[in-house]
């Protein structure tokens, strides 16, 4: 099911994006190309393909977690633009 320009406009409105007519056309074409490709992928027979999480046999290699002393409070607060009662003071977020 192809995406219409009206649907792209609706999504842009929800995302608070202002798109030019050229951008609307381009995004409509790009999204439709993606959906066509998805249809091709959905048509593939994958019954005999083993599910994998990663195509390469790799594992994450992590370093050991070592606790180390942190910065003293005074040193950490030195570069702060504003400090109150030994803590960073930041503008209120409403």
Curated annotation (Swiss-Prot):
Q: Which GO terms describe its biological process?
A: glutaminyl-tRNAGln biosynthesis via transamidation; regulation of translational fidelity; translation
GO molecular function terms here? Answer: asparaginyl-tRNA synthase (glutamine-hydrolyzing) activity; ATP binding; glutaminyl-tRNA synthase (glutamine-hydrolyzing) activity
Q: Which UniProt keywords apply?
A: ATP-binding, Ligase, Nucleotide-binding, Protein biosynthesis
Q: Which Pfam families match?
A: GatC (PF02686)
Kindly indicate whether the keyword Methyltransferase belongs to this entry: no
Catalyzes what?
L-glutamyl-tRNA(Gln) + L-glutamine + ATP + H2O = L-glutaminyl-tRNA(Gln) + L-glutamate + ADP + phosphate + H(+); L-aspartyl-tRNA(Asn) + L-glutamine + ATP + H2O = L-asparaginyl-tRNA(Asn) + L-glutamate + ADP + phosphate + 2 H(+)
Superkingdom of the source?
A: Bacteria
Record-linked InterPro entries: Asp/Glu-ADT_sf_sub_c, GatC
| Location of the region described as Disordered in the Swiss-Prot/TrEMBL record | 72-94
Q: EC number(s) of the enzyme? A: 6.3.5.-
Q: Which family does it belong to?
A: Belongs to the GatC family.
Q: Function, please?
A: Allows the formation of correctly charged Asn-tRNA(Asn) or Gln-tRNA(Gln) through the transamidation of misacylated Asp-tRNA(Asn) or Glu-tRNA(Gln) in organisms which lack either or both of asparaginyl-tRNA or glutaminyl-tRNA synthetases. The reaction takes place in the presence of glutamine and ATP through an activated phospho-Asp-tRNA(Asn) or phospho-Glu-tRNA(Gln).
PANTHER family from the UniProt entry: GLUTAMYL-TRNA(GLN) AMIDOTRANSFERASE SUBUNIT C, MITOCHONDRIAL
Subunit arrangement?
A: Heterotrimer of A, B and C subunits.
> What is the name listed in the Swiss-Prot or TrEMBL entry for this protein?
Aspartyl/glutamyl-tRNA(Asn/Gln) amidotransferase subunit C
Native source species: Moorella thermoacetica (strain ATCC 39073 / JCM 9320)
What gene is behind this protein? Answer: gatC
